[in-house]
Design a protein with these regions (language model features):
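An N-terminal assembly and electron-transfer interface module characteristic of large anaerobic redox
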Residues: 1-140
Length: 140
């Protein structure tokens, strides 16, 4: 898919790989593993996940965020609109994509590609407009 190989479109983070790394006593490895589970953003309320996502997006300088809603995951799907509102209040555009992360036969690849392409185009337009505004302010 051509969307995966665009220079201007890069994945800068994934909430599943962003884990809590608390200080721990090497003599208590099970306690350390338990802390990683308990304090991970996906363990807890939806607002905890949303706030962690906003923090990660800001830390990485992301231009936008894709919120993938796994079919059948009430936690993810139920929080999608709240996430959209919270991210956008922080100036971070968010695209909600629903799909089946386990079974590709459920399809939707064409629609997903179209929606992702439109989102990337919108982000590119916003970036270009911001660059133009910055150049205009420097010219004055």
């Amino acid at each position: 898919n051509e969307l995966c190989f665009q220079e201007k479109a890069q994945i800068v983070g994934c909430e599943l790989s962003h884990v809590c790394e608390p200080d721990f006593d090497p003599e208590k490895p099970y306690e350390a593993m338990a802390r990683r589970m308990v304090y991970h953003a996906l363990n807890g309320s939806a607002i905890r996940r949303i706030e962690a996502g906003i923090r990660h997006a800001k830390e990485t300088g992301a231009d936008g965020v894709v919120w993938f809603g796994h079919w059948g995951c009430k936690h993810t799907l139920g929080a999608a609109q709240l996430a959209k509102r919270k991210f956008e209040e922080q100036g971070i555009p968010l695209l909600i994509l629903d799909g089946d992360g386990c079974d590709r036969s459920h399809g939707g690849e064409g629609q997903t590609s179209t929606r992702l392409g439109a989102f990337l185009e919108m982000l590119n337009t916003e970036t270009d407009e911001n660059t133009d505004r910055q150049e205009e302010s420097h010219d004055e």
